Amino acid sequence: MAVSSLSIRCGGFSPTISHKTEILCPNPSLKACCLLSSGGKADSSESTYQKGSGNNWKRRQALVGVGTLVATSIPATLLLAEEIPKSYSPFVDREDGYSYYYPSDWREFDFRAHDSAFKDRYLQLQNVRVRFIPTEKNDIHEVGPMEEVVYDLVKHKFAAPNQVATIYDMKERVEDGKNYYTFEYGLRTPIYATTSFATVAVGNNRYYTLIVGANERRWRKVKKQLQVVADSLKILQI
């Protein structure tokens, strides 16, 4: 992979169902660990990929309860048939075609230009959020090879100009015929640093991105917990 700015450095639950109202928002096996000096244009960490001002984004009200879940969503009933990891709850968005798990004690919140988001009660940097953009592609493989896709996302979409980005690991999984790229990366400034997992997939003419992360100082403690979240993203047929 020849990129001029790249230097190589080895190295019991409560289901949540989405019910939405339209509002106007005011505003992917690792071949090498990559140390990137970001040159992409961004307002803040990952802000370039969060662009969406002037588009119609959706704010949701969460309805909690197995009865509601079964009554409103067939894909959700299938999710219930699976073993939900202890201390996690499933989020199912039948309308937009995706689902994932999040820690049961996290709270829902609004994250600009994202379709859904949950965060730790006390640590704001410890959160998960999902967004999607339109695409004519049918699978993440059509976007490109995993190494190229991950590099482009981290360098050009996630990192701000004042951040150094490091890609630690990446992997691919196939589930129900759908391909997913999941990768671990860090963003660092002189003031603070974060580490995250991201999972990307394509389906329903949409490019889905899930990001779950935490402050770098807490990463060793919460990495396994957040890995479950990153690996849980599923594309549901609309």
UniProtKB/Swiss-Prot annotation:
Keywords: Chloroplast, Membrane, Plastid, Thylakoid, Transit peptide, Transport. One of its GO terms (cellular component) is extrinsic component of membrane. One of its GO terms (molecular function) is calcium ion binding. The keyword Plastid applies. It is found in: Plastid, Chloroplast thylakoid membrane. The keyword Membrane applies. It is a peripheral membrane protein. Transmembrane segments: none annotated. GO terms for biological process: photosynthesis. Signal peptide: none annotated. Disruption phenotype: No visible phenotype. InterPro entries: Mog1/PsbP_a/b/a-sand, PsbP_C. Part of the chloroplast NDH complex, composed of a mixture of chloroplast and nucleus encoded subunits. Component of the NDH lumenal subcomplex, at least composed of PnsL1, PnsL2, PnsL3, PnsL4 and PnsL5. NDH shuttles electrons from NAD(P)H:plastoquinone, via FMN and iron-sulfur (Fe-S) centers, to quinones in the photosynthetic chain and possibly in a chloroplast respiratory chain. The immediate electron acceptor for the enzyme in this species is believed to be plastoquinone. Couples the redox reaction to proton translocation, and thus conserves the redox energy in a proton gradient. Required for accumulation of the chloroplast NAD(P)H dehydrogenase (NDH) complex. PANTHER family: PHOTOSYNTHETIC NDH SUBUNIT OF LUMENAL LOCATION 1, CHLOROPLASTIC, PTHR31407. Belongs to the PsbP family. This is Photosynthetic NDH subunit of lumenal location 1, chloroplastic. The gene is PNSL1.
